[in-house]
Amino acid sequence: MEFVADLHLHSKHSRAVSRDMNLPTMALWAHKKGLDILSTGDWTHPIWIREIKQSLEEAGNGLYTLKSQISNSKSQTKQVRFLLSVEISSIYSQGGKVRRIHNLIFSPKLETCEKINASLVKRGCNLNADGRPIIGLSSENLSELVFSIDENAMIIPCHAWTPWFSLYGSNSGFDSIDECFGKFADKITAIETGLSSDPYMNWQIKELQNRSILSFSDAHSPAKMGREATVFVSKNGNSKITYQDIRLAIMQEKQAKFKIGYTIEFYPEEGKYHFTGHRNCNYVQTPDQTRKNGTICPVCKRPLTVGVMHRVEDLAKDGFDKEVYKTNSNGVKWITDPAKIHPPFVKLVPLNEIIAESLHSTVSSQKVKDLFDKLCENLGSELNILLKVPISEITKQAGEKVAQGVEKVRKGDIEIIAGFDGQYGIVKIWKDAQIKEKQQDLASQLGIDF
């Protein structure tokens, strides 16, 4: 039995988040997406935690369900469950630098949330302004506060490589978990990859070798949910999962009833900070070019935003281990390490993007939305379609072009121009004039061939 979890989401009470990020709509989209466990998000916000208490009921195991469940004839196989999680932004000075670190907190019960909130308010933190509050506590002090209230809570550094707001961030982060979390470093048993890195990149970091690598969407709208996810698999066929099961699986405890089976990944090149560069100057560098040319923009002479790939290579142990690829019977390309000590992962392109490119349309167009809904209704869920449904069945429902797009995504047969300095990368299933032009520009700039 497996449970697909997206445990980093935001509510409508966070800045730049869709009004549709409410609990019933999130649950409805979870069925479309193929997600079993969702983050509530934002439980530090006074209005949102009140909505959580009004809309959810405890399932007796540290997870919560809607008091009235949404039903979907084909895609609902289990009740959608919610885990109490929140992202907190810590901005503080340490070691002569300003640090900006974002951490996820997982809570096993509402009582713990309320105690943490009360303690934060007592320390002068403003929890009303944003669902993702900004506080002045260091990561170490935040850990002390949380673990003194409930030792079963978890703290997970989120989007761990983002330049501006993360554990390893090139502009305001640290070089190690020990440096960031101090005496609580041993309690940090996992990190979240973020969109600009994947597990393979994180496997190169020595201190992450024995920690879990998690992936979640950080979605600000329902349609973005599940673009990254972590799948928990039962070791003995259990059909029920608890908060403690998730916690022990992440901690990789021997007595855990579940383990991390695999993760679902965004293409890291599509992330906003994969390469080094300056968006306003339209200038980008690969890690090799950055080592050669430095981190000053040749156009404006200001510091470049150092990308995630370069930062990973800076902190990595000597040499990168080789990726191992395996294609399963559904034509899906899986990636793992040579020793197979880490859970495998798969890189996907969202179904609505495949449909949009196939129809020469946009993801926001009504015809793309209609076909997406039709496919999820008739074939089970987005993740089921992307990973398991026979291509022949997709052809019957959506036509050859969409089916071919899904098949190409499963094989990893796509075109990518990496993102940099806050600009998303470009992913195309079929090479077009835009990709060719971008590749020619990049080749000219970097002196490489595509």
Regions found by a protein language model. Give the residues of each.
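Short acidic/histidine-rich active-site segments
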Residues: 211-227
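Extended substrate/RNA-proximal surfaces in nucleic-acid metabolism proteins
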Residues: 2, 50-189, 447
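Histidine/acidic-residue-rich catalytic or RNA/ligand-binding cores of hydrolases
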Residues: 15-18, 49-53, 165-172, 203, ...
